[in-house]
Amino acid sequence: MQRNLTQSKEALLKSYNSRLKEDIRSMRENFEEIIRLAKGENDTQLSKITQCEQDTYETQVRAANIVRAGESLMKLVSDIKQYLILNDFHSVNEAICSNSTLYRTTQIDRDNKLMAVRDDMAADLYDLEEEYYTSIYK
């Protein structure tokens, strides 16, 4: 069962990684092609108006591809957050246990300090009472 869970996590992480690389590659390639089209140094047999329309259409398609890849990246981030929130009980339990241990240690330390202050105050109060009752100025 544990092995299947580990393999499932590995497969999911590989899937996330491949989606990330694919979307970034798509954004980069489309951006490079838009820049190439912006240079406008194509010597073709098409008329300038036809070439301009073709370049405009290709730029719009590539811009739409960049937007699609960006939306896919946002979905990927959302999926990763959801996965971590819903499935990462081990780290949540570790954090709770470590905080609990820290708070217990702090509580014990404070209790010891309070007891030391109590004992010092009791000893000082005893000394003051003894001094008061043995004083000639009462």
From Swiss-Prot:
<keyword id="KW-0805">Transcription regulation</keyword>
<dbReference type="Pfam" id="PF06179">
    <property type="entry name" value="Med22"/>
</dbReference>
<dbReference type="GO" id="GO:0006357">
    <property type="term" value="P:regulation of transcription by RNA polymerase II"/>
</dbReference>
<comment type="function">
    <text>Component of the Mediator complex, a coactivator involved in the regulated transcription of nearly all RNA polymerase II-dependent genes. Mediator functions as a bridge to convey information from gene-specific regulatory proteins to the basal RNA polymerase II transcription machinery. Mediator is recruited to promoters by direct interactions with regulatory proteins and serves as a scaffold for the assembly of a functional preinitiation complex with RNA polymerase II and the general transcription factors.</text>
</comment>
<dbReference type="GO" id="GO:0003712">
    <property type="term" value="F:transcription coregulator activity"/>
</dbReference>
<keyword id="KW-0539">Nucleus</keyword>
<dbReference type="InterPro" id="IPR009332">
    <property type="entry name" value="Med22"/>
</dbReference>
<feature type="coiled-coil region">
    <location>
        <begin position="13"/>
        <end position="40"/>
    </location>
</feature>
<comment type="subunit">
    <text>Component of the Mediator complex.</text>
</comment>
<keyword id="KW-0010">Activator</keyword>
<keyword id="KW-0804">Transcription</keyword>
<protein>
    <recommendedName>
        <fullName>Mediator of RNA polymerase II transcription subunit 22</fullName>
    </recommendedName>
</protein>
<dbReference type="GO" id="GO:0016592">
    <property type="term" value="C:mediator complex"/>
</dbReference>
<keyword id="KW-0175">Coiled coil</keyword>
<comment type="similarity">
    <text>Belongs to the Mediator complex subunit 22 family.</text>
</comment>
